[in-house]
Amino acid sequence: MKYDTILVDGYQRVGIITLNRPQALNALNSQMMNEITNAAKELDIDPDVGAILITGSPKVFAAGADIKEMASLTFTDAFDADFFSAWGKLAAVRTPMIAAVAGYALGGGCELAMMCDLLIAADTAKFGQPEIKLGVLPGMGGSQRLTRAIGKAKAMDLILTGRTIDAAEAERSGLVSRVVLADDLLPEAKAVATTISQMSRSATRMAKEAVNRSFESTLAEGLLHERRLFHSTFVTDDQSEGMAAFIEKRAPQFTHR
């Protein structure tokens, strides 16, 4: 499939989506949001892909939503256009997704990064939800995912003031998984994605589902769901291979079945 605003590549069992609107600082217009979602969905159904990496340029991950596309909208226009419906489809991707962020990840860019399962940041990264400065509020999940990631007090601080935080503060707050030097960002992100992609495909998908369920259920419900997923791994070839390899003190050879 041909894309105009992103680049799609592969590295071993990793699908790589690179945001590519440099003239607009990777601002997320409706075309780009749809292309990111469509590419991720294509990679999600590819049996040879075990992880998806989303990244931008060294200077900017994504500077936010494309304000020029939204500025003149009426309520009816915004409601009918439903700019963010693509994000619901992206959230349904079952393959583990890793965001590799350098430079600015603001507004929709921060929200896109938070939709990923791991967020690896360069030491140059800056995060924020500055929508309040435009007379609006986060509209792509920022008020919900940011609060779950860093807690109410910190989320209120960022959303109500619109201030940005650097990579170190983002890591201390629990927003990012790890921080690396800018030159090491893509090698580190590829290494993490490759490690995940080499695990059992069904097991990583179930693990992602179990963790995500913890945000939407009681502890008792989450534990029951986890237990059922755990039991279901025992019908897979990968469970047999993984445990046999452990007993035999060798590396497992998963077939993703």
UniProtKB/Swiss-Prot annotation:
It comes from Mycobacterium leprae (strain TN). CDD domains: crotonase-like. Pfam families: ECH_1 (PF00378). Belongs to the enoyl-CoA hydratase/isomerase family. Gene3D superfamilies: 2-enoyl-CoA Hydratase, Chain A, domain 1 (3.90.226.10), Lyase 2-enoyl-coa Hydratase, Chain A, domain 2 (1.10.12.10). One of its GO terms (molecular function) is enoyl-CoA hydratase activity. It catalyses: a (3S)-3-hydroxyacyl-CoA = a (2E)-enoyl-CoA + H2O; a 4-saturated-(3S)-3-hydroxyacyl-CoA = a (3E)-enoyl-CoA + H2O. The keyword Lipid metabolism applies. Could possibly oxidize fatty acids using specific components. One of its GO terms (biological process) is fatty acid beta-oxidation. This is Probable enoyl-CoA hydratase echA8. Keywords: Fatty acid metabolism, Lipid metabolism, Lyase. Its EC number is 4.2.1.17. InterPro entries: ClpP/crotonase-like_dom_sf, Enoyl-CoA_hyd/isom_CS, Enoyl-CoA_hydra/iso, Enoyl-CoA_hydra_C.
